[in-house]
Amino acid sequence: MSLGEINENVKLAREYALLGNYSSAVVCYQGVLEQIKKYLYSVRDSSLQQKWQQVWQEINEETKQVREIMTTLESFQMESTPSKPSSFAQDNDIMPVHVEHRSSPCVVRKSSVPYKDSKGHGNRLSVGPRGQARPSPRVANGDKGKPQKSKEKKENPSKPKEDKNKAEAVETEVKRFDRGGEDKDLIDALERDIISQNPNVTWDDIADLEEAKKLLKEAVVLPMWMPEFFKGIRRPWKGVLMVGPPGTGKTLLAKAVATECRTTFFNVSSSTLTSKYRGESEKLVRLLFEMARFYAPTTIFIDEIDSICSRRGTSEEHEASRRVKAELLVQMDGVGGTSENDPSKMVMVLAATNFPWDIDEALRRRLEKRIYIPLPSAKGRVDLLKINLKELDLANDVNMDKIAEQMEGYSGADITNVCRDASLMAMRRRIEGLTPEEIRNLPKDEMHMPTTMEDFETALKKVSKSVSAADLEKYEKWIAEFGSC
């Protein structure tokens, strides 16, 4: 995809709109908006991003105008059949022009007047070149067609402005990975795993875990800000493994990395790198890392990495699975060479697992930083309660410190479940014993009752912790032996 293609697609969309083929114009406009979105993700310069965002807004405004025209025309079509008798009676001065148009060679094939009226806007491509014949469908519809014409004229002056903005924005080709040949489908599949939309999770949305956030900033953010410092022995970390029980915020940390760090972010799972065809899974792994180096700086997030690269040499291991693991290990070892000389071209693998003891030893060595994501501390539990309850009305008797004390041993996901259950208690009390019709007629104010301390105590009795003490002991033992914080 090049800037020339974007420009041509914009021209094509406007030509369709001017000729009255609005459905095709909308399709072209949508394609242009998607192309600009993809290009925006590859732009690193903030001023350049603002210009392209302005271009996107203007193109989007044109699309809305074309949609409004389509809606107006559809309403005309719906009204055309019932309004026909009254139009003969009231619009006598317009009908002679309509009859003259029927004698035109281009429209003589039409079987009836209502059919021609309903299709008039779709025939402009064939009628347009005949000069005087083109405006006749608008005259046939009376004055309703005039605002439509003025909208098309308004779009025309904006065209030079759009082209000027595009020319000033960037004059280079759009950066896109392309190896051609039979790998194109595999590349397209991997490109779908590039997160182009903001997950909207910031560091402040994650309670506690200060050490983990500090390490991730050091591994991803600081090398971008201080490339001269992170060289040689101080090169950026090429692999980080997050270990911990379920529901402690490992995936949430990855979302924060995608939001806060201006790097290309690949979200990869076992389904992404698995194929039923022999040799294709290894090829997907190789292409993933080639694309990562091409779009560098890049972060590859592999969730539940134990499902992809479990321990080799076991009796349950399949030969195809072993080949995929070998390719992944080879590619990860090759990642470091691309970032040692230029930290801005780094590729970092960020992995998460609930079963660190099942991971292959060679992969454990390549994931240089192995950090423990523990259950929330007392302060972390209070912070989590504040984050989860910030949109709720709380009664005066709610004591968050006391609630946090009763939640010792709960994971972050468990605390969220308690808050969700407590927030529904008032609604459950209000609708108890009511019929469905009475529930539908309840005022909204009565549904938004403050959440009380009693609601939290009831929710705590219903929601138990999901992590056992034996599991915590296993994690702590593993991190004490293999951890690298």
Curated annotation (Swiss-Prot):
It holds the Pfam family KATNA1_MIT. Disulfide bonds: none annotated. The keyword Transcription does not apply. Gene3D superfamilies: 1.10.8.60, P-loop containing nucleotide triphosphate hydrolases (3.40.50.300), Phosphotransferase system, lactose/cellobiose-type IIA subunit (1.20.58.80). It catalyses: n ATP + n H2O + a microtubule = n ADP + n phosphate + (n+1) alpha/beta tubulin heterodimers. GO terms for cellular component: centrosome; cytoplasm; microtubule; microtubule cytoskeleton; midbody; mitotic spindle pole; spindle; spindle pole. GO terms for biological process: axon extension; cell division; cytoplasmic microtubule organization; microtubule severing. Residues 141-173 have a biased composition (Basic and acidic residues). The keyword Nucleotide-binding applies. ATP binds at G244, P245, P246, G247, T248, G249, K250, T251. It comes from the Eukaryota. ATPase activity is stimulated by microtubules, which promote homooligomerization. ATP-dependent microtubule severing is stimulated by interaction with katnb1. Residues 101-173 are annotated as: Disordered. Its main location: cytoplasm. It is an enzyme of class 5 (isomerase). One of its GO terms (molecular function) is ATP hydrolysis activity. It is found in: Cytoplasm; Cytoplasm, Cytoskeleton, Microtubule organizing center, Centrosome; Cytoplasm, Cytoskeleton, Spindle pole; Cytoplasm, Cytoskeleton, Spindle. Keywords: ATP-binding, Cell cycle, Cell division, Cytoplasm, Cytoskeleton, Isomerase, Microtubule, Mitosis, Nucleotide-binding. InterPro entries: AAA+_ATPase, AAA_lid_3, ATPase_AAA_core, ATPase_AAA_CS, KATNA1, KATNA1_MIT, KTNA1_AAA_dom, MT-severing_AAA_ATPase. Its EC number is 5.6.1.1. Belongs to the AAA ATPase family. Katanin p60 subunit A1 subfamily. Catalytic subunit of a complex which severs microtubules in an ATP-dependent manner. Microtubule severing may promote rapid reorganization of cellular microtubule arrays and the release of microtubules from the centrosome following nucleation. HAMAP family: Katanin_p60_A1 (MF_03023). Can homooligomerize into hexameric rings, which may be promoted by interaction with microtubules. Interacts with katnb1, which may serve as a targeting subunit. This is Katanin p60 ATPase-containing subunit A1. It comes from Danio rerio.
